[in-house]
Every structure is written in structure tokens, then in C-alpha cells.
Amino acid sequence: MRTFIAVEIKNEEVLNAIVKIQSDFKIKATPVNKRNMHFTLLFLGEIPEYTADKVKKELSSVSFKPIDVRFTHVGVFPNPRFPRVVWIGVDELASQKLIDLACQVEKKLEPLGFKSDRPFKPHLTIFRIKNKGVDISQNVEKFKAVDLSKEVITELKLKQSILTPNGPIYSDLQVVLAK
């Protein structure tokens, strides 16, 4: 099964504001469905069920307090002239708390062979761009600063992802609550 560790966005006001940004962005790209909005803390990839059970055991010992998140800006990977992903970033305090949580998760799962190939950068993907050579510098500049409602992260999830022609279908394999 294809799996990852994530924290989800559930605040309807935030989700609707993101959908508005997506519709105002005016680019030929695949928008992320608002029901699939999340921060991927660690991508695990294809794992067998017995490994998922080991992951669940380790995740159950992750401890974190609720995290207040304010969305503050739009960014692009790798850059606005050759974009692949358009994302929304968060304030510095939330960013550090999400980084700390991602590090804690990785530390718990490293003995099982899971390690990120790059440092975690908190971002909420809102578009995936397939066609190359689309310069979206002006769009990014227009949405350089955003101020959406606050989201409070209270759950960490082990998620399964099933890829379909209509986009991924996510399901929860485990939920760890903030303490």
C-alpha cells in the first residue's frame, strides 16, 4: 500500500478560501481537491501491511500539542518560471512547530528504514503543473501575501493513497491526537 504521514486541513473557512485562490489563479494546472488538503510530514511509499503495523506502533508514541497555523503566502517549487507545484506557506511559528513534528515522526520511523530525502518545508500543495515552460511569476506576485483563517492542527495521520485517473483517493490508517 502507498502511504504517507500527514496533518490535514479541515477548517471549512480555510478550505473555501483556498478554493477561491485556486479559481482566481488562472493557470492550466490540476488543482488539489479541497478534501485532500494536507501537509505531508513524511512520504513512506509502498509498504506491506506488516510494516504499516510497525509504523502505527511507532506513531502511537508521537506526542505533540495542537498547532495553530496561519497561512501567509503563496510559493512555487522549483521556481515561478518553471513551476511544478504551487503551494501555500504558513507563518514562522507554525512552520517551526510543523518542522519539529516532522522531525519527531522521522526519528521514530528511521529505525524502520524511513528517512526523508530532503529537509521538510511546510507547504500546502494547491496545484500540480504538468506542462513545462509556463511562467506564473505574475500570478505568484499577485498572491505573494495571503491571510486566511486560522487552522488548528490536532491530528497526525498515517494515510493510504490510491492513485486513480481522477486523482488520489486517501484513507486514514491511523489517527494520533494532539495531547
Regions found by a protein language model. Name each.
Residues 1-179:
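Histidine-dependent nucleotide/RNA phosphoesterase domain, centered on the 2H-phosphoesterase fold
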